[in-house]
């Protein structure tokens, strides 16, 4: 059968896939999905995050009466949210997507589970083509381009949602610290993060992940330094996640000592700015 999965009245795609588990072991189902619907299959669900904003989005009554309004306009949502809500999306939720060599997939899924316990995960294969640009294959950073494109099989892992311990009521879960640990491992593997998600790296760490050689050549050639922002300055969050590291470290110290004395303030209840402003 042909299944136009992006139709407003249809179940959100990840829920449709989840429903395949009900077929039973050894059962299979084949469908034909129009190309555009397939390419846009995660748009209505906002990569599985819509349930956090609109819990009724997958209910039949909502899909048939108001499903035509999905997905919400992301520019509008981002432009109208207050600072406290922006802090909440950094400290109490995760919006991350990484690409890394395919052979490391099992390791990274295990790490995502140990650090965050967020499901479902978004996973799909991708081909990385090294043409000497900002995305290079492991080991090629800073090396002159040979003129011959190199390719490698990578896997993409999207982690979108609320960490398990936060759902269970943990008010002192060190989300930023844990995401940074995952970022660090991705860098070690020669992978990279998708910059439409929140970037928790420092600028030095970001430059390890992406090859800036040609970009720096162009900056020098056109004397752009000081006139235009760096790539990192363009993509980093407007609210600095690194500003929360010291507080999260204090939670870990207090937990190891078995004392809550240093837990001065719960996340989301104070105004936080960039480092040095608190």
Residue ranges and their predicted role:
Residues 75-84, 89, 147-150, 166, ...:
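Activity-critical C-terminal alpha-helical subdomain
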């Amino acid at each position: 059968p042909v299944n136009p999965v992006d139709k407003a009245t249809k179940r959100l795609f990840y829920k449709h896939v989840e429903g395949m588990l009900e077929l039973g072991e050894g059962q299979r189902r084949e469908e034909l999905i129009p190309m555009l619907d397939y390419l846009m299959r995660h748009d209505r669900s906002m990569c599985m995050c819509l349930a956090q904003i609109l819990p009724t989005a997958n209910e039949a009554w909502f899909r048939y009466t108001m499903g035509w309004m999905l997905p919400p306009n992301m520019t509008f949502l981002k432009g109208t949210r207050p600072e406290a809500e922006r802090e909440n999306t950094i400290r109490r939720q995760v919006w991350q997507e990484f690409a890394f060599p395919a052979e490391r997939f099992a390791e990274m899924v295990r790490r995502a589970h140990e650090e965050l316990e967020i499901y479902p995960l978004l996973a799909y294969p991708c081909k990385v083509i090294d043409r000497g640009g900002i995305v290079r294959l492991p080991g090629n950073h800073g090396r002159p381009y040979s003129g011959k494109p190199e390719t490698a099989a990578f896997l993409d892992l999207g982690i979108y949602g609320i960490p398990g311990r936060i759902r269970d009521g943990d008010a002192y879960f060190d989300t930023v610290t844990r995401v940074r640990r995952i970022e660090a491992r991705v860098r070690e593997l020669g992978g990279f993060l998708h910059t439409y998600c929140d970037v928790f790296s420092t600028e030095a760490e970001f430059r390890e992940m992406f090859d800036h050689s040609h970009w720096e050549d162009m900056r020098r050639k056109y004397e752009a330094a000081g006139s235009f922002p760096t790539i990192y300055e363009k993509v980093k969050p407007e609210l600095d996640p690194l500003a929360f590291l010291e507080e999260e470290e204090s939670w870990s110290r207090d937990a190891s000592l078995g004392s809550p004395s240093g837990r001065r303030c719960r996340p989301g209840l104070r105004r936080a700015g960039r480092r040095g402003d608190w």
